[in-house]
Amino acid sequence: MKTIAVLTSGGDAPGMNAAIRAVVRTGLDKGLKVMGIQRGYSGLINGEIFEMHRYSVADIIHRGGTILRTARCEEFKTEAGRKKGVNILKAFGIDGVVVIGGDGSFQGAQLLSKLGVKTIGIPGTIDNDLAYTDYTIGFDTATNTVLDAINKLRDTSSSHERVSIVEVMGRGCGDLALFAGIGGGAESVIVPEKEFNEDELCKTILEGKLRGKLHNLIILAEGVGGGEALTKKVQETTGIQTRLTTLGHLQRGGSPSAFDRILASRLGVKAVELLLEGKSSRVVGLRNNKVVDDDIDEALSMKSKFDDELYDIAKILSY
C-alpha cells in the first residue's frame, strides 16, 4: 500500500472535512501518498484527482460541506462507468480508496471492491440511517441546527398562539426528527417508523389549548410526507392558525459540532489503518462509543435501529 485516495459522495454532511483531514494526515503520517478525488464518483471517472498534502487540509476542520465537493453520477451505475473508474485509479497508482458518504456511496464502494479495488467506507450523512453505527458524521450538527430553528419558531408560535409544523430531513429514518423533537421540547414527533393518527393529534392540540398552552410544535420527518395536507387538516379541525416550515437543505450546512469533528477524526484514522492492514470492503462506525468496522455487505443489510425507548420518552414529555 503506497497510495490511497479519498472522496466524498452523495449528500454533504457537516464533519466531512474533518474526516478528509483525518484521512490525509493519517496517511501522510504512515508514509503514504494521498490523493483527493473531486466530485465523488463523477470526478473519479473523469480523472479529477490531485495529490494532497498536510497544508491541503489546514483550517478545514471547522468548515461545513466538503472541500472535495460532491456529486451524483449516473455513469458510475453502469459497468462500463465503473471499469473506467478502476482504470483511472490504476493510472494514478492508487491502491485503496476511502469513501465518505451514505448508503448509496457505500454501494458504490462495494461495487469497486468487487472489481479489485480496496475500499473503506466512512459514514457521512445527516439522516443517521445506517444501522451498523450508532451515529453518522453530520447527524449531531444537523440535530442542533434543527434545534436552533425550533427555538426560534417557539418564540413566534407563542406570540401568535399558533401551531408550527416543522418538516425535517429523514426519508426512511426518523432519528433527526426524534432527537430534535426531544431536545426542542416538541409536542409531537411524527416519524416513518411509527404510525400516527391525525384526529388524535388534533384532539391533543385542542386539549393543550384548553390547558392554556400558547403554542404547539410538531416535528415531521420528510419520509412521512403530507406536510401541507397535515397543516390544512390541523387548522381546519382545531380552528387554530397552523403554519408549516420546511427546513430543507439548511440542515446540511453549518460548522460541525465538537461531537462530529471528533467522530470524523476517529473514523478517518481507523479507515487508513484498515487499508494498511490490507483490509477491504469494510465500513467504520461507532457502537457504544467504540470505533468498529464491519463488512460492507453486512452493514448495508442491517435493519433500522430506531430507538423505541427514546420515542416513548418523547411521548411522555410532550404535553
Curated annotation (Swiss-Prot):
Activity regulation details: Allosterically activated by ADP and other diphosphonucleosides, and allosterically inhibited by phosphoenolpyruvate.
Binding locations of ATP: 11, 72-73, 102-105
Class in the EC hierarchy, top level: transferase
Pathway note: Carbohydrate degradation; glycolysis; D-glyceraldehyde 3-phosphate and glycerone phosphate from D-glucose: step 3/4
One Gene Ontology molecular-function label: 6-phosphofructokinase activity
Location of the active site: 127 (proton acceptor)
Binding residues for ADP: 21-25, 154, 185-187, 211, 213-215
EC number: 2.7.1.11
GO CC annotations, alphabetized: 6-phosphofructokinase complex
Residues where Mg(2+) binds: 103
Pfam families membership: PFK
Keyword Kinase: yes
Record keywords: Allosteric enzyme, ATP-binding, Cytoplasm, Glycolysis, Kinase, Magnesium, Metal-binding, Nucleotide-binding, Transferase
Binding site for substrate: 125-127, 162, 169-171, 222, 243, 249-252
Subcellular location: Cytoplasm
Catalytic activity: beta-D-fructose 6-phosphate + ATP = beta-D-fructose 1,6-bisphosphate + ADP + H(+)
Self-association and partners: Homotetramer.
Known function: Catalyzes the phosphorylation of D-fructose 6-phosphate to fructose 1,6-bisphosphate by ATP, the first committing step of glycolysis.
Family: Belongs to the phosphofructokinase type A (PFKA) family. ATP-dependent PFK group I subfamily. Prokaryotic clade 'B1' sub-subfamily.
The protein, known as: ATP-dependent 6-phosphofructokinase
Biological source species: Clostridium novyi (strain NT)
